[in-house]
Amino acid sequence: MEFLMSKHEADAPHLLIVEARFYDDLADALLDGAKAALDEAGATYDVVTVPGALEIPATISFALDGADNGGTEYDGFVALGTVIRGETYHFDIVSNESCRALTDLSVEESIAIGNGILTVENEEQAWVRARREDKDKGGFAARAALTMIGLRKKFGA
């Protein structure tokens, strides 16, 4: 997939990566992909860790509130985590609600968010999506955030 923003157009955007570390090894792989994509684009970033995917939207909201109160302003956000289906309905709740909350934040606050929260049936599927040499969803989420930053600037939002 081709993204719409070159390194020059970005003017060194500053992003916040919010990673859920429920599965540490998978989190490392997703973060590695996201960092590599942002480094390649010349972007800067901070990383904050949260317990699980449901905490990611709230953390982004905290960052937005903090910026309003003189804290760090971010041009965009990258959400990373893994939700693997188990034996209960919990998978559906976490998957649906984390995605819905990220979409709501993106639309209501007019912010750029790359969603790299994997929602998979098993660990094998997660690894295929997390590894840089495979689907590199961490890198994809970072590049998506950069694209949305570019579009936001293009439209003057």
Curated annotation (Swiss-Prot):
Gene3D superfamilies in the cross-refs: Lumazine/riboflavin synthase
Pathway info: Cofactor biosynthesis; riboflavin biosynthesis; riboflavin from 2-hydroxy-3-oxobutyl phosphate and 5-amino-6-(D-ribitylamino)uracil: step 1/2
Keyword Transferase annotated: yes
Family: Belongs to the DMRL synthase family.
PANTHER family per the UniProt record, alphabetical: 6,7-DIMETHYL-8-RIBITYLLUMAZINE SYNTHASE, 6,7-DIMETHYL-8-RIBITYLLUMAZINE SYNTHASE DMRL SYNTHASE LUMAZINE SYNTHASE
Quaternary structure annotation from Swiss-Prot or TrEMBL: Homopentamer.
Protein name, as recorded: 6,7-dimethyl-8-ribityllumazine synthase 1
Source species: Brucella melitensis biotype 1 (strain ATCC 23456 / CCUG 17765 / NCTC 10094 / 16M)
Classification of source organism: Bacteria, Pseudomonadati, Pseudomonadota, Alphaproteobacteria, Hyphomicrobiales
